[in-house]
């Protein structure tokens, strides 16, 4: 099973993000993220055998944190707006989200999981399959937009089920 650890976004944030999702959906070569799939990935685990699931859950239950606020501001692209592969909304935080991601990683590192890159807080809103100059226009248009604030009260172990129509994400366990 394909697993990752994430923070889901509140419905209020989903609503505020819908206009950019709609615009991205209208751009050739871009796949916008479905509103119900919006999340902040703390750690991607990849393909994991079911026999490891209990140990992953046990380690994640050891992660402790207090609820904290994050805000969503600005739009950018990885690696850059001129050659975008991923379109994202920035996540402003005071370090708590990064500490949570690092704590998740430290617990799961003991089970052999590795990061492919350092954690950079962001909310993916689209994936670019084919280069299209319209993407840079959208990034510019929303570059200083504010999408609201939410409180992080939990994180989730999620399964990603890949289908021809796009991924389906299923919560396996919620950690508070």
From Swiss-Prot:
**Pfam family of the protein (one):** LigT_PEase
Where is the motif HXTX 1 annotated in this sequence? 39-42
Catalytic center at which residues? 39, 122
What superkingdom heads the lineage?
Archaea
Q: Where is this motif: HXTX 2?
A: 122-125
Tell me the GO molecular function terms: 2',3'-cyclic-nucleotide 3'-phosphodiesterase activity; RNA 2',3'-cyclic 3'-phosphodiesterase activity
Asked if the Swiss-Prot or TrEMBL record annotates the protein with the keyword Acetylation, the reply is: no
Supply the EC number(s). 3.1.4.58
Q: Which UniProt keywords apply?
A: Hydrolase
Task: Give the InterPro entries listed for this entry.
Answer: Cyclic_Pdiesterase, Phosphoesterase_HXTX, RNA_CPDase
Which reaction does this chain catalyze? Answer: a 3'-end 2',3'-cyclophospho-ribonucleotide-RNA + H2O = a 3'-end 2'-phospho-ribonucleotide-RNA + H(+)
What job does the chain carry out? Hydrolyzes RNA 2',3'-cyclic phosphodiester to an RNA 2'-phosphomonoester.
| HAMAP family, sorted | RNA_CPDase
The similarity annotation says: Belongs to the 2H phosphoesterase superfamily. ThpR family.
For this entry, the protein name equals RNA 2',3'-cyclic phosphodiesterase
Task: Tell me the organism.
Answer: Archaeoglobus fulgidus (strain ATCC 49558 / DSM 4304 / JCM 9628 / NBRC 100126 / VC-16)
């Amino acid at each position: 099973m394909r697993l990752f650890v994430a923070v889901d976004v509140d419905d209020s944030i989903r609503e505020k993000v819908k206009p950019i999702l709609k615009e991205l959906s209208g751009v050739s070569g871009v796949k916008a993220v479905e509103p119900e799939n919006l999340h902040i990935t703390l750690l991607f685990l990849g393909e994991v055998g079911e026999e490891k699931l209990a140990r992953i859950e046990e380690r994640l239950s050891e992660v402790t944190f207090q609820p904290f606020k994050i805000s969503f501001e600005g739009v950018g692209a990885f690696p850059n707006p001129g050659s975008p592969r991923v379109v994202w909304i920035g996540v402003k935080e005071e370090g708590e989200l990064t500490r949570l991601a690092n704590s998740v990683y430290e617990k799961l590192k003991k089970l052999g999981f590795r990061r492919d890159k350092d954690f950079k807080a962001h909310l993916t809103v689209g994936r670019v399959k084919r280069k299209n100059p319209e993407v840079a226009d959208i990034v510019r248009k929303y570059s200083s937009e504010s999408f609201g604030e939410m409180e992080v009260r939990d994180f989730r172990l999620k399964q990603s089920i890949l289908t021809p129509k796009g991924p389906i994400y299923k919560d396996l366990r919620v950690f508070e």
